[in-house]
């Protein structure tokens, strides 16, 4: 069974890894905001820790930006009940344990895997 993580569990994971320095394997992914994963990086190199997806939940597109940020902002809050976090998985680097949020954007003719380094200060 896939573990559904609560806000509290996500915060615990983020706090326990907040001082981890990225290794050579994952340093290209260490962006404070969402980035598209390069086709050269195999996301399966990241260990699955859990998901923020609620099984059977309706797809929602509303985002949470009370301070005028947007999806791509490095200061955008991590609000697990809002898009894209409610469709994200939590993964860690198998070499250094750095933690990331990961989701796949499904466009009409493409798939875009996106990743963001998990910052405990931004979890709301």
Put a short name on every predicted segment.
Residues 1-8, 18-81:
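Short recognition patches in nucleic-acid-associated and regulatory proteins
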Residues 1-20, 112-124:
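Short, intrinsically disordered terminal segments enriched in charged and Pro/Gly residues
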Residues 16-22, 86-89:
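Short metal-coordination and nucleic-acid-contact micro-motifs, chiefly zinc-binding Cys/His arrays
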Residues 78-124:
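Short, compact, well-ordered microdomains
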